[in-house]
C-alpha cells in the first residue's frame, strides 16, 4: 500500500471517468467510493461494477485507457473477483488493485475475515486515496456544487 496513493494521485487526477469494481463483501465499499467519493466529492464520472456481473456485459467497455479500481475481497466470493481481475490484467492497463489479503485481512480467522472487507477497504479508499486525489486535483473534497448549496 505504501506509495500506491501517490501512483493513484498522479495517474488519476486528470481522468474524467474512473470505474470501481467490487463484489460480495466489498461491493458496499466500491459503491461508496464511486458515488460518494469520486462523483459527489471529486465530480468524476464513476460507474460501480459488480465483479460477479462484469463478464456479463460491462467488460465490453474495457480498453487500455479505462482506469479501473478493483477491490479483491477475502472470503467466499474471492474466486469471482479473481476471475474478473484476470480478464482485466489481460486487456486493461490502468488498473488499481486493492487486495484484502495484501492489506492483512487474512490475519483474522477465516470464519470472520470476510465480514471485515468493507471496513478495511473503506479506510484506505476514503481516508487515503480520496484525500490524495483531492490534493492532486486541487479540488477540496468538501466542495459541492449543489449539495447543501441549493434547494433540492
What are these model-predicted stretches?
Residues 8-152:
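A SIS-like phosphosugar-recognition module
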Residues 1-8:
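Short, small-residue-biased leader/transition segments that mark boundaries at the very start
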Amino acid at each position: 500500500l505504501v506509495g500506491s496513493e501517490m501512483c493513484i494521485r498522479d495517474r488519476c487526477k486528470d481522468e474524467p471517468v474512473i470505474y470501481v469494481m467490487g463484489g460480495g463483501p466489498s461491493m458496499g465499499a466500491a459503491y461508496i467510493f464511486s458515488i460518494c467519493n469520486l462523483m459527489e466529492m471529486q465530480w468524476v464520472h464513476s460507474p460501480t461494477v459488480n465483479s460477479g456481473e462484469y463478464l456479463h456485459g460491462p467488460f465490453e467497455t474495457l480498453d487500455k485507457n479505462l482506469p479501473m479500481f478493483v477491490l479483491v475481497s477475502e472470503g467466499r466470493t474471492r474466486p469471482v473477483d479473481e476471475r474478473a481481475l484476470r480478464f482485466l490484467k489481460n486487456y486493461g492497463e490502468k488498473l488499481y488493485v486493492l487486495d484484502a489479503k495484501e492489506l492483512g485481512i487474512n490475519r483474522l480467522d477465516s470464519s470472520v475475515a470476510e465480514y471485515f472487507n468493507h471496513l478495511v477497504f473503506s479506510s484506505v479508499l476514503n481516508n487515503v486515496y480520496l484525500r490524495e486525489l483531492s490534493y492532486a486535483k486541487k479540488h477540496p473534497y468538501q466542495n459541492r456544487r449543489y449539495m447543501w448549496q441549493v434547494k433540492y
